[in-house]
Regions:
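Metabolite-binding pocket within alpha/beta catalytic cores that recognizes anionic/polar moieties
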Residues: 2-116, 147, 162, 234
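Short acidic/polar alpha-helix capping motifs at helix-coil junctions
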Residues: 17-19, 118-124, 198-199
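Short alpha-helical interface patches
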Residues: 17-28, 32, 134-142, 187-192
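Conserved active-site and cofactor/substrate-binding residues in soluble primary-metabolism enzymes
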Residues: 18, 46-53, 104, 135, ...
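Glycine- and other small-residue-rich loops at beta-strand/loop junctions that grip anionic moieties
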Residues: 40-44, 98, 129, 170, ...
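Solvent-exposed, flexible loop/coil residues
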Residues: 75, 79, 83, 90, ...
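Active-site rim beta-loop-alpha module in soluble metabolic enzymes
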Residues: 101-182, 186
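Regulatory input/activation interfaces that engage signals or partners
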Residues: 173-237
Length: 237
């Protein structure tokens, strides 16, 4: 991702190894941090605490700006899997305005990507736990004005703000606002740093036809989001 001055080093934080694959970085497990052609990449694992630790690790490598790259769930029904959100603001609490993202980097990314990807701007909400039901998604959208939700962007933005370095996020949508995730899958996700775990596989295997259908559609849409991230990485290189 080449946004910013050519000599600047970017600290890119992703939650999952599959998200790192989209920028050509392989073999890095959660907790890892490796050099990258534009700076450093950290794979944090899922969730805010992991994301904050990863941002602090990569910042210590001497980067000039921080970025969060990965997938998010839609709160706005107009967003579909494979769409790309470049948020202008990250929020995490109803009584806090959150963090603005760097406008110059946003504009550079949007211009680079808009020829081949559907780009959306707006507020990204960072949750502590998965937002899984349609009712919860609708309530969060109405209360916050956010168009999508993730679990990592806000703590990374907070680290960037404390260090006084620019921050940007790019999120490919993997979960539509209209999807209801089975409770079995949500519980397994909530207890995992890596996304797919043995507990998730067991939850799917023993969940019955409804869970199997949900898992298939989730995997399909995650694939669409991952393809969008790979396209974005190629266009922004």
């Amino acid at each position: 991702m080449s946004a910013g001055a050519p000599t600047e080093r970017i600290g890119l934080i992703v939650a999952l190894p599959a998200e790192a694959h989209s920028i050509g970085v392989r073999g890095v497990q959660p907790g890892g941090c490796v050099p990258w052609r534009h700076g450093w990449v950290a794979v944090s694992g899922i969730g805010p605490h992991n994301a904050m630790r990863a941002a602090e690790r990569v910042l210590a490598c001497g980067v000039d700006r921080l970025a969060n790259w990965g997938v998010a769930g839609a709160l706005d029904a107009a967003l579909t899997p494979g769409d790309v959100l470049i948020p202008d603001r990250i929020r995490y609490a109803h009584d806090d305005p959150g963090f603005a993202t760097d406008p110059d980097t946003r504009e550079c990314l949007a211009m680079a990507l808009c020829t081949r990807l559907r780009i959306r701007h707006g507020t990204l909400w960072s949750a502590v736990r998965p937002v899984a039901t349609c009712a919860d998604k609708q309530a969060l959208a109405a209360a916050s004005g956010a168009v999508a939700v993730d679990m990592e962007a806000a703590p990374i933005a907070a680290v960037a703000a404390r260090a006084k370095v620019p921050f940007v996020a790019l999120k490919a949508i993997c979960d539509p606002a209209t999807r209801e995730l089975p409770a079995r899958i949500v519980r397994a996700m909530d207890g995992s740093d890596t996304g797919v775990s043995w507990s998730m596989l067991a939850a799917i295997a023993f969940g019955g036809p409804g869970t199997w259908r949900a898992a298939r559609s989730l995997a399909r849409d995650f694939g669409r989001a991952r393809d969008a991230l790979a396209t974005a990485a190629a266009l922004a290189a």
